[in-house]
């Protein structure tokens, strides 16, 4: 049984615009699955629907997690079940220090500090620093990744985790994703970075115009995406 199963999902925005048009995918326990495709193909909307964000309406299909139909569950109940997401634009968490933010995610301070090290931040330097304007966009992204890792969710959706990071950080990011797997998390990775997708993904889905149009080995799916003008970038660029 798949950990996550999305069946024939159709999703509309509040104004009735159809964004996801019959998408289906699965993620198994401990698996890293890429979701790639051009901008505007519906990837982020599909991800937000999976975790239960408001602003979208499921008009057909279902989302199942751990064998349970969660299509109509609110986001906080999905989070309690072990389903979470790292956003493309991380929150600022004004007024909290990095340590306070991570303490919301785990009671194990040693593990939280280790998570900071894994994402490339020295806990001695960052633990007592305030979030928000005191951190650069790249630093906020790293803190967000550390927080998600600290929670040890069953499934984490990473929406463009390389956004705001320089290309020299890609190897570190791959290690972060692999560490998430080692700690028991399956990963659904949304990315435009072909090197990252090929390096960490076990399988890949290609989404275009609101539909899943291909599934298979990441290298094969990346190639098809490039042939279709999917807008992927090379990590070395």
Please name every model-derived segment.
Residues 36-38:
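The feature captures the beta-strand-to-loop junction immediately N-terminal to the Walker
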Residues 69-84:
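ABC ATPase NBD coupling module
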Residues 148-149:
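ABC ATPase C-loop
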Residues 191-192:
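H-loop/switch region of ABC-family ATPase nucleotide-binding domains
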Residues 197-199:
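A short, surface-exposed alpha-helical micro-motif characterized by mixed small hydrophobic
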């Amino acid at each position: 049984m798949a950990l996550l199963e999305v069946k024939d999902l159709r999703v509309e925005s509040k104004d009735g615009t159809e964004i996801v048009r019959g998408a289906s995918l699965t993620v198994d326990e401990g698996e890293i699955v890429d979701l790639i495709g051009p901008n505007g193909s519906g990837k982020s909307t599909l991800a937000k629907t999976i975790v239960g964000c408001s602003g979208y309406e499921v008009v057909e299909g279902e989302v199942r997690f751990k064998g349970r139909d969660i299509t109509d569950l609110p986001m906080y109940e999905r989070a309690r079940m072990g389903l979470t997401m790292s956003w493309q634009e991380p929150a600022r968490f004004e007024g909290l220090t990095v340590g306070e933010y991570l303490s919301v995610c785990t009671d194990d301070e040693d593990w939280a500090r280790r998570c900071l090290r894994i994402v490339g931040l020295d806990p001695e330097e960052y633990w007592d620093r305030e979030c928000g304007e005191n951190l650069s966009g790249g630093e906020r992204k790293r803190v967000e990744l550390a927080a998600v890792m600290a929670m040890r969710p069953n499934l984490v959706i990473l929406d463009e985790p390389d956004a705001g990071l320089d290309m020299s950080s890609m190897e570190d990011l791959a290690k972060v994703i692999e560490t998430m797997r080692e700690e028991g998390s399956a990963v659904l990775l949304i990315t435009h970075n072909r090197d990252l997708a090929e390096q960490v993904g076990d399988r890949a889905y290609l989404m275009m115009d609101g539909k899943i149009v291909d599934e298979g080995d990441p290298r094969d799916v990346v190639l098809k995406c490039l042939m279709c003008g999917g807008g992927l970038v090379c990590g070395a660029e």
